Amino acid sequence: MGKEQELVQAVKAEDVGTAQRLLQRPRPGKAKLLGSTKKINVNFQDPDGFSALHHAALNGNTELISLLLEAQAAVDIKDNKGMRPLHYAAWQGRKEPMKLVLKAGSAVNVPSDEGHIPLHLAAQHGHYDVSEMLLQHQSNPCMVDNSGKTPLDLACEFGRVGVVQLLLSSNMCAALLEPRPGDTTDPNGTSPLHLAAKNGHIDIIRLLLQAGIDINRQTKSGTALHEAALCGKTEVVRLLLDSGINAQVRNTYSQTALDIVHQFTTSQASKEIKQLLREASAALQVRATKDYCNNYDLTSLNVKAGDIITVLEQHPDGRWKGCIHDNRTGNDRVGYFPSSLGEAIVKRAGSRTGSEPSPPQGGGSLGPSAPPEEIWVLRKPFAGGDRSGSLSNVAGGRSTGGHALHAGSEGVKLLATVLSQKSVSESSPGDSPVKPPEGSSGAARSQPPAAHAGQVYGEQPPKKLESASASASEGKSAEAVSQWLATFQLQLYAPNFTSAGYDLPTISRMTPEDLTAIGVTKPGHRKKITAEISGLNIPDWLPEHKPANLAVWLSMIGLAQYYKVLVDNGYENIDFITDITWEDLQEIGITKLGHQKKLMLAVRKLAELQKAEYSKYEGGPLRRKTPQSLEMMAIESPPPSEPAAAECQSPKMTTFQDSELSGELQAALSGPAEAGAAAVEKSSNHLPPTPRTTSRESSLSGRARHISSSQELLGDGPPGPGSPMSRSQEYLLDEGMAPGTPPKEVRSSRHGHSVKRASVPPVPGKPRQVLPSGASHFTPPQTPTKAQPGSPQALGGPHGPATAKVKPTPQLLPPTDRPMSPRSLPQSPTHRGFAYVLPQPVEGEVGPPAPGPAPPPVPAAVPTLCLPPETDVEPGRPKKRAHSLNRYAASDSEPERDELLVPAAAGPYATVQRRVGRSHSVRAPAGTDKNVNRSQSFAVRPRKKGPPPPPPKRSSSAMASANLADEPAPDVEAEDGRLGVRAQRRRASDLAGSVDTGSAGSVKSIAAMLELSSIGGGGRAIRRPPEGHPTPRPASPEPGRVATVLASVKHKEAIGPDGEVVNRRRTLSGPVTGLLATARRGSGEPAEQSHFMEDGTARQRLRGPAKGEASAEGPPLARVEASATLKRRIRAKQSQQENVKFILTESDTVKRRPKAKEPDTGPEPPPPLSVYQNGTATVRRRPTSEQAGPPELPPPPPPAEPPPADLMQLPPLPLPDGNARKPVKPPVSPKPILSQPVSKIQGSPTPASKKVPLPGPGSPEVKRAHGTPPPVSPKPPPPPTAPKPAKALAGLQSSSATPSPVPSPARQPPAALIKPASSPPSQSASPVKPPSPGTPALHVPAKPPRAAASVVSGPPVASDCASPGDSARQKLEETSACLAAALQAVEEKIRQEDGQGPRPSSIEEKSTGSILEDIGSMFDDLADQLDAMLE
């Protein structure tokens, strides 16, 4: 590199030594000798045109600059952009470098290629000293750059106050502030004021105004007001308006600032700006008729005859406050002057209508005698009111002006009206001038009359009368508001309410946000007022029918004054008004917040009424109830119906978080409830639901039901349809589905959150159900609380209220309703630990069942095992969970059998939840399962047949279920009926959530599960009906589903709002967490369950059958949830329906749709599960969702081969049929499982082995898995567990669970096997074939000895470790071996059948039935033993 380049680099690096060396003159002698007399080029420029001096100036290094200048570097050398060292020194902003360069003679006014002189750069960057130095060196501040900006423009644009002051104090100030000739046409034309206004620099605007700049100076874009309004600079707009800028100026596009705001902005700031501009455009201006000067009053305004005074407001003593703008100086003089001093002039067409109305209010009310001044003055104060556009609304008198308010142009009319009134009463000097406009005033006037009285709008009562009536009504309402505020010593806010157009009825619907908007900014006062608002008992003041026309409607709500405004703006038809929005109201000039709110409330009510009408014809269970819901929606509910109200007082129907359910949901909830509990609803009808409710109800009924059921479960119970809806619901309705408080979008997110909250004691926990008005409304579904108390599982503390357990007899539920519930279940299974899980009572479903407060019907899909609330539940029911909710995860193709009513034989609990199509359970994508915070799982999942999403890897989940299964036999077994479903469910959820440690078979997780099962299981366990008792177990409707839900929950760890894993329950005794709830609900939800499927292992365990189901889905569900779940037989399911296919719809895990729903031999009640996996070998209860065959086939020996890992890795292959899973058949060796240590079980296997008796698809156990108990105290992995069984289990699990391959199958222990059973169609994918439905497919895995042993004491509880279980163990092992062989045979059969493809359910039922019967005998033995042990 040459010396020049070296010099540039040295200067750039500020290497003074090198620079000096390079610049040093060579010694003459040496130079000659060396021949290097060549002098270094100091002005060498690099590729960018930078010389060494450029770099030195940019760096601000004075030493280098001096060195270079001494070396005769060119001072004004330009770089590629035309920039000189002086430019860079000015830009860098340091005085010393500048001095050096200026002293060297650098030119100050030579521009760069962009037209910038150094002063531009110094001003733009706010370098005061440098700018001052440049001015002292004669820099020209009037030079413009290529964009037409002077240094002052740049300083104003970038907010450089000091530089602006400096420039304005220069001798060039006047020239800088003078408009340039081409400003109005030049697209680049601008001014310092425009730039400062555009960027919100208030201090600079003040400086410019003080310097005398023309405030109304225009460019092509208009005045500075246009710029500030367009850019949302509220304070600038206020300052400019206060400074007297003309708000009526139009730009070259003929737009006023208000037009621009309406057209281009939608922000909150724009609302304020609109209000300010409306007020300004309607500002009253008067011409002074004589001179006035009062030197003794410093606040007085000295005026001369002819001065134009802008009236700002009226002083209490009658004087007016005015502003006189001095165009010469640009200053404004503000002060008070006698109202008799001026005559009103209609200078601005839009003269501030908003404010005007207020004057009319005063003047009109005063009568002709009122001086015009009063009218004008009032107007201004009400400028804010104008915003609401209902100043007139507030006071009848005002209304006259109010109309004009709406349309800026109306201002003139308004003014005329006021003037005319004035002239009539006491003519002021200004009256006469105003009279001419009177014609227009007449129009304005006509508006008011109608407005106030609701008179025909065509008629126009005399203005006086009109004003008087308006002011009278306004006065009355204002007085009422004042008195109300006085009752709690906050009357100081009366002006805030009245000026914003609020009357008591509208106040009753105010929210904290509304209070803040009108100026109640102190939290303490706001809270007090909110509390008082909630105490207001104002009857519904909204029209209960759709009026004939807009005029009538407006008069009914007391806003007749807006008739003309609305008609002028295209809302002449009563049907059009329902489409109006807040923004529309602002735009057309209805700016008073109170009037806006009243209008929007009325609009919503109107929309509801219309929807109600439509719904009458549309049909739809929800819709038909619409009318009632409407009635139910009473404003009665806490007065504030808006979001704030919702916040303040959660409506009866609230999400778990207290957030209100969206109007639709509430409506839907109430509607369904109505069906079942019309009477109840009617009682609640006293709260007239808003029409909104009905309309939404119809659309959202399905979802709402889901939500409601979850709420009910929580204990929120659907508030009476009418009860809670009231205020918040209205608001919600207004907002759409938004939760009560958050107006609009909050709702969905809230739901998600609420789901999370559910895990924590949700607000619902409080007996919100008992809302004042809603209490009576509870529909049967609300009863849920009753079951809740007793059921240990009932959402425990946090969810205490949620009665997920209570399940109405599905039979009672009308089929139509029931279907909804299953879907509703999906609501929040994914929500981790979401209490919603308990959507059991679908309100819609409740209808028929509404047997009093009987347990709310559980959504068909929800396996709400009502754990008998230990004792609370009706006797019998609790235990009858057998049928309770067994839902088969029907193959997707299979119609959801939500409707499948459990045969009456099923018993009260046999609410056969409709089977959720596998696709549903599976459907929830793994992602979903992560946390599907479906707001309440609103989305009713379509029953698609798609393969279930891969189950998340949740070995712990599997383990959890296994643990559950293993959980002490005593608990589970002892109370198998109860515990089985309930405890299992609970445990499942507990375990699933907590144990989801991720190690499929981690000993700890297994131990934890066992412990949980042993600890909580017993208490929780629902007592299993005596073995002989065919009462079907309410297996979770779809173990798979529940499992999926659980898994998903697990996956999420049911993370609570605070981030903790809510799902985990340390002990079964612990309150069921949201997870559990989710599981419960999950069973109902197909999609979400698929997520849980990921957790498939746990789930699978939970419902061994789930796998079985999955695989056996096509084939009989016979696949017992074998390993773990023999405990609780799905026989509930079987009894549920003969026609129900044994589709083990893995519902959640595997959800293979291939198997057409196999007809469950449901009719024949499966004998009590012989093997209860509690402590012992887990014979998976065959998920045969219904276990048609009495024999609950013990799961076939778990396929030993497929290592869980492999399977896990295998993507869930859709198994077309249960057979699809061809995983290795579990060897008969399941016995070994007992002996094998859990550790062998591959994480997952243990769970698998433990598989909690997976209730049938709907078995509660599955749910328990969801609950994923936290790894309570990790118990040592049960030593005895045969690896094979584990594998087999794993295979089964994986097959059932894998239906939706989890992204990390590995997590799923054996479930990992996941044979792609998840995808119903693919069969071959996984090596292990889950036992086909017919196959008991459950390996009897050894249960963790410890938990099983400890818990299971007693006869041959198959608790491997259980000391009491030795003989039992042997028997179990023997039976297991036999079963394994039988199962293998069955599997072969099923495989063949599956290969053949789904067959008619009847055929499947037959084949399944025969297989089940074959294996049944074996299981009967096991079941007998287990029953004996349990008892």
UniProtKB/Swiss-Prot annotation:
The SH3 domain covers 281-347
Mind telling me which Gene3D superfamilies this protein's record contains?
Ankyrin repeat-containing domain, SH3 Domains, Transcription Factor, Ets-1
Tell me the GO molecular function terms. identical protein binding
Per the UniProt record, one Pfam family is Ank_4
At the highest ranks, the source species' classification is:
Eukaryota, Metazoa, Chordata, Craniata, Vertebrata
Which residue intervals make up region (CASK-binding)? 375-471
| Record InterPro entries | ANKS1/Caskin (IPR033635), Ankyrin_rpt (IPR002110), Ankyrin_rpt-contain_sf (IPR036770), Caskin1-CID (IPR032232), Caskin1/2_SAM_1 (IPR035497), Caskin1/2_SAM_2 (IPR035498), Caskin1_SH3 (IPR035495), Caskin_C (IPR032117)
- How is this protein named in the record? Caskin-1
User: Where in the sequence is Phosphotyrosine found?
Assistant: 253
Q: Does the keyword Zinc-finger apply?
A: no
